[in-house]
Structures are given as structure tokens and as C-alpha cells.
């Protein structure tokens, strides 16, 4: 299971905000650090291709090498998101849109956490969610 935490900055002490996440990905899976500049054209989707759009904000991502989406990232508006794995017994589409794809879409388009949340919700309602996110053991 993933562990994600956030520590708020404090104006009185001058402390810095921290956002961190460990990864529960397969141990042999390569992760890439990727910079996506604003103004570039994003063509989202690991398994299901979604409509392309223009990236609104610079984004820094850590993502599995084979996947379009990301495990964790932050954009130039200081919006940060970490993917959390869910385990359930409900059937899922084998080739659906991954949660990590939605994470990247939100970071490339949102200027606030609230906006990022709405982007994820709206896209999930429009395109669904599913797909196999495993590397060695799908």
C-alpha cells in the first residue's frame, strides 16, 4: 500500500511545505522523472486515448517508464498529487483509463487542488476508470 503525507508550511516559523509519497510499484519497474512544459500538447492515455489538450502549467512527474500517467507530481501552481492504489473485488475494465492518467491530466490543467479534484471527477464520470496498472504482475 502507498503512504502519502503532507506537512503544511507555517508563516510564523517560516517552515516549508512538504509532500511525499512512497511507491508500491513492482521493484523492477523503472521510474522516470519527467518535465512537461506548459504550452506543449498532451495526448493522454496509457490504454485508452483521450482527446489531446494544451498543457496549462509546467509539471514535474515521477512515472512508470511504460505509462503515460504518473505516480506523483507537482505543477508550477504548487498543486501536488500522489496516486493511491485501491484494492477491491469489483470487476474493472482491462483497458480503461488509469488513475495515474487522471493524476497527470489534473496537474497539467489545474491551478488549485479544488480544480484538480474536479478535473479528476469530471473525467472519471465521462470516461470511467479501469485498466491494469501492474508491471510484472498485472
Question: Where do the model's predicted regions map?
Answer:
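A contiguous strand-loop segment
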Residues: 1-99, 119-138
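A structural signal for well-ordered alpha-helical segments within the folded catalytic domains
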Residues: 100-101, 114
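Second-shell loop/turn segments in exported
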Residues: 102-109
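Short, charged, surface-exposed loops that flank catalytic or proteolytic processing sites
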Residues: 109-117
